[in-house]
Amino acid sequence: MDPVDPNLEPWNHPGSQPKTPCNKCFCKVCCWHCQVCFLNKGLGISYGRKKRKHRRGTPQSSKGHQDPVPKQPLPTTRGNPTGPKESKKEVASKAEADQCD
């Protein structure tokens, strides 16, 4: 490796800057163009100013999206309609009857 002139600034050293300028292309070659391109394009890290995302205004026809919810039929219950408490009592009474036999 050739010795570098000590009076030269680091950013002016030979090979410190690419021969072509950076562009907005995201292809594999352009992602490896320089360290800045690699950070921005390859890794998606940018320390620049963030752009504001514009919020879309609500259309005039909609009133705050306050549409009524359509009524749905109640779900039908399956199994024993009397509930689990009475079924436990029935099981207990059957168990007592079996013990007596």
From Swiss-Prot:
Region listing for Cysteine-rich, in residue ranges: 22-37
Gene3D superfamilies on file: Tat domain
GO CC aspect terms: extracellular region; host cell cytoplasm; host cell nucleolus
Residues in cross-link Glycyl lysine isopeptide (Lys-Gly) (interchain with G-Cter in ubiquitin): K71
GO biological process: DNA-templated transcription; positive regulation of transcription elongation by RNA polymerase II; positive regulation of viral transcription; symbiont-mediated perturbation of host chromatin organization; symbiont-mediated suppression of host innate immune response; symbiont-mediated suppression of host translation initiation; symbiont-mediated suppression of host type I interferon-mediated signaling pathway
Modified residues (Asymmetric dimethylarginine): R52
Region listing for Interaction with human CREBBP, in residue ranges: 1-24
Protein name per UniProt: Protein Tat
Native source organism of the sequence: Human immunodeficiency virus type 1 group M subtype G (isolate SE6165)
Protein's gene: tat
